[in-house]
From Swiss-Prot:
The modification N6-acetyllysine is found at residue 188. The lineage of its organism: Eukaryota, Metazoa, Chordata, Craniata, Vertebrata. This is Mitochondrial import receptor subunit TOM70. PROSITE patterns: TPR (PS50005), TPR_REGION (PS50293). TPR repeats lie at residues 117-150, 156-189, 297-330, 332-365, 370-403, 404-437, 445-478, 479-512, 514-547, 548-581.
Amino acid sequence: MAASKPIEAAMAAAAAPGSGNGVGGGGGTAGPGSGAGTLPRWHVALAIGAPLLLGAGAMYLWSRRRRRREAGGRGDASGLKRNSERKTPEGRASPALGSGHHDGSGDSLEMSSLDRAQAAKNKGNKYFKAGKYEQAIQCYTEAISLCPTEKNVDLSTFYQNRAAAFEQLQKWKEVAQDCTKAVELNPKYVKALFRRAKAHEKLDNKKECLEDVTAVCILEGFQNEQSMLLADKVLKLLGKENAKEKYKNREPLMPSPQFIKSYFSSFTDDIISQPMLKGEKSDEDKDKEGEALEVKENSGYLKAKQYMEEENYDKIISECSKEIDAQGKYMAEALLLRATFYLLIGSANAAKPDLDKVISLKEANVKLRANALIKRGTMCMQQQQPMLSTQDFNMAAEIDPMNSDVYHHRGQLKILLDLVEEAVADFDACIRLRPKFALAQAQKCFALYRQAYTANNSSQVQAAMKGFEEIIKKFPRCAEGYALYAQALTDQQQFGKADEMYDKCIDLEPDNATTYVHKGLLQLQWKQDLDKGLELISKAIEIDNKCDFAYETMGTIEVQRGNMEKAIDMFNKAINLAKSEMEMAHLYSLCDAAHAQTEVAKKYGLKPPTL
């Protein structure tokens, strides 16, 4: 089974199975309750305080979108303060009247210091509304000087109002300074915290900005879209910034054998992944069961193929390099195989020149060139270059129209681009060429299901569910079919049956760690059984200690439990296993969100609800 992270099947078009991380090709499975195939994955990062979307981890954005759905177009009644821009200062423009208060127009001796401070503030508010910000600043400064030092709340308001005026003049340093004064006086002052967050953004103080906006999100109960959007923005920037530096110096890491086998299982028309032919092996050791056969020719490529059959993957790149350096008989095959393993270890920059060369070799087998185009196209999609990706897939279809892999992988690309009808047409083309290719049939059914589910079309949903039943009956050895069916069953709240489907996956592929993660998440959503869920995710790590999905999921759950230190440790482990800069940026955003929550808890004692 080409099991992947809990993302929609579409996401697999841009990732190797089980990773979501920049390996070309791949036929990944969606996990339970995902919804992330249509959502940017870094939205998972701000998991602070929002409800846990069990089975997906995308707590933050789910919380936001759920409120949108509940609003049902009710406008301001939605509960999301979309237009709450916090531009105006606080307090009324005219002074409040009451016992012992005059109209605030003069310096009456009968007025207390606080009264005079309020009068100065109100005068400043009038100037502010008139766009006379320098005069407003003078009035707010007067209010600050007049206000008794023990009047913390009033004094904090004056500082915040002056910060608002400085903001209009784009004096960001002064904005941050005044907001800091306001927060020191009133630590849970949302308006001052948010204004300081915006100032930090302008000053390029991303870490400080994130801490402030995190506090705001918690204090507002995730009800203000403006603050959530700022948090999302800064998390993306921080993630990309951190990943860019880290990725340069990362150590390439070969994934697990199960991961590699799952990856190659998504190709059926691929020369380099086919078993060695009789003529490529000698007969010397054919009677020795369990021992590798000697390669007949002195060929680096054929030795690499032998190592593939032995699952001795670490030696493949070096053997391919020998074939290429010698310009041997299998140079084109060696270039493609080396590029594929560069992709698998997360070295896309090293893979691209090899893929380019294979594509340009007009004399090379068309199957090799088409396969190289598929992998380069998928790599482009992972690098957020959909136009280049589409061009490569279309070229592959043009030069090798009978290649089922082209349509299978292009179908996944189309799903990622939200072109479901075109995706289904591609899956149909693949199935016509390879009627027994279960993976394509399962993914077509899942595409139809997601389309019906999103459109809330119950009759089509039921038709898709029936289609899954037919697929697992027709292809009982296809773990992918069970996994995708489990996703659909989870959506339909049929948890018991979904659990049975994951058990089928485990029976078929006991070494596939991602299935244990999916099953663990299901226990949380179904039975709220945290211990069982964590036990299964821990089992996944035991089976495959290179399963970054397991570490990421464990970290996300620990965030919800309030165990920030452990969560950060899990995210860091996942970061070290990431195979693309984009995947690494996403994981850094998770880690940064956890760090920010830790700091907010220390500074302000703010802790969102935990599991």
